[in-house]
Amino acid sequence: MLKKLYSKKGQVSMEMGILVASAVAVAAIASYFYAVNVKYSDTHAGETAKNTSNALINVTENVCGNISEITIP
């Protein structure tokens, strides 16, 4: 009877160890991808800012170019 009891405790302990090890592995993988995305986010942010700035400049130039064509009835 004691042998069964100890073996069940060992089984539960091993299962808990596997569960904790799995959680640590998932956290390590997630943190790696987070770090990679943070590392390259500044490059993409700069490109996005340039594209937005160029689009606003184009709109402004179009509107300013059409100011002389405005007529007041």
Curated annotation (Swiss-Prot):
PTM description: The N-terminus is probably cleaved by the prepilin peptidase EppA, which recognizes the class III signal sequence.
Signals that turn on the gene: Expressed under standard laboratory conditions at 35 degrees Celsius.
Keywords: Fimbrium, Secreted
Stored InterPro entries: Class3_signal_pept_motif
Residue stretches in coiled coil: none
Motif (QXSXEXXXL): 11-19
Main location group: secreted
Entry superkingdom: Archaea
Cellular localization per UniProt: Secreted; Cell surface; Fimbrium
Prosegment location in residue numbers: 1-10
Keyword Secreted: yes
Any one Pfam family match given in the protein's UniProt record, by short name: Class_IIIsignal
Disruption outcome: Disruption of the gene does not change the piliation compared with the parent cells.
This protein's GO CC annotations: cell surface; extracellular region; membrane
Domains: entry comment: Contains an amino terminal motif QXSXEXXXL, which is part of a class III signal sequence.
Protein name per Swiss-Prot or TrEMBL: Probable minor pilin MMP0528
Originating organism: Methanococcus maripaludis (strain DSM 14266 / JCM 13030 / NBRC 101832 / S2 / LL)
